[in-house]
Amino acid sequence: MRGTEHLELCRLIALLFLSFLLNGFAYSQRYPNHEVNKLLDVGIEYVLNQNYELARLKFRLLDKKYPQLPFGKIYLAVVDITKAFDYGEEIKSEAISESLDEALELSEKLLKNNPIDIWNHYFVALSKGYKSYLKVLNDEWISAISSGLSSVNYFEDCLEMDSTFYESYVALGTYKFWKSRKLEFLEWLPFFDDESEKGIEYLELALAKTSYNRNLAVVSLIWIYIESKNFYRAIAIAENELKKNPINRTLKWALARAYEDVDLRKAIQIYDDLLNSYKSIPDQNHFQEITLKHIIAQQYVKIGEKREALRLCDEILTDNRLTEVVRDKLSDRIKRVRKMNKELIE
């Protein structure tokens, strides 16, 4: 994959992996409390449809009514991370870490008091998984994988207690694949075990065996198939899922990327839809607009439509709405846009 885009996809994959883990108990394994399930179902639906403020209200209510459970604190972290990533905003790592520390403390207390309850193992796994993810946000991949091992162990505990706890397959499958890909430079070592294929097997199993969870685990599979250059499988999964969540930007972005290696004009069309979606967001920082315009310009160059690519470069370079913080985050991309612009006019 291409430099910066590769890094962005890796970060997105990590986000999808860890945020999707939190929805794993639905339908196949539901927490034994109707009101808790209802609040979670509604809040999760708001997240999937990018209604972040409404989702936050539901999870705050959940945390207020059930302070002894870590669900509310974990899901409030999910909302903050997902919204920040979707909008291209800075992630408030310190506040999120504090919330997850509280969730982990609750989870470990529950586990200590009742170690035979599978949910208590699951709570610890989720809390530790998200703490590991904060390292991913800072591109600390080795450290993230190392600390993530503890989370993985708890997911494995869930499977030992109940082999039909398919949500653990989602977590373990995603972990096994990306651990293998991120550490493949260590493959010469005797202890290195490439489990990427096993990871795909686990995810396909979860896809076939779960209901609500398949709408979540599927995105991890899409990016894995893109990474594995199995673009048609990625497209098939994404298009099927978009029938259920047609406005979901995460799915659209994955689908567009898959089409880049199959049908560039189709990819441009989907990226344009995404661009229009971001333009409609009030009071946004325009980070994703700039990112998408650059990506679309790159696709136009590939198909020889240099005039359209130049138009987009000009729009990026003359955009005066960006704050200093956003411009700094986009500095590398803007340099590449300037280079592209120069090459197009020569």
Provide a role label for each language-model segment.
Residues 152, 191-200, 272-276, 306-322:
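TPR/TPR-like (Sel1-like) alpha-helical repeat modules
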Residues 69, 117, 165, 213-214, ...:
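Residue-level recognition of tetratricopeptide repeat
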Residues 310-346:
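Terminal, low-structured helical/coil segments at or just beyond the last alpha-helical repeat
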Residues 31-38, 46-59, 76-164, 169-212, ...:
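Short coil/linker segments at helix-helix boundaries
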Residues 13-23:
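Bacterial N-terminal signal peptides
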Residues 82-92, 133-134, 179-185, 264-269, ...:
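Alpha-helical linker/edge segments of TPR/alpha-solenoid repeat scaffolds
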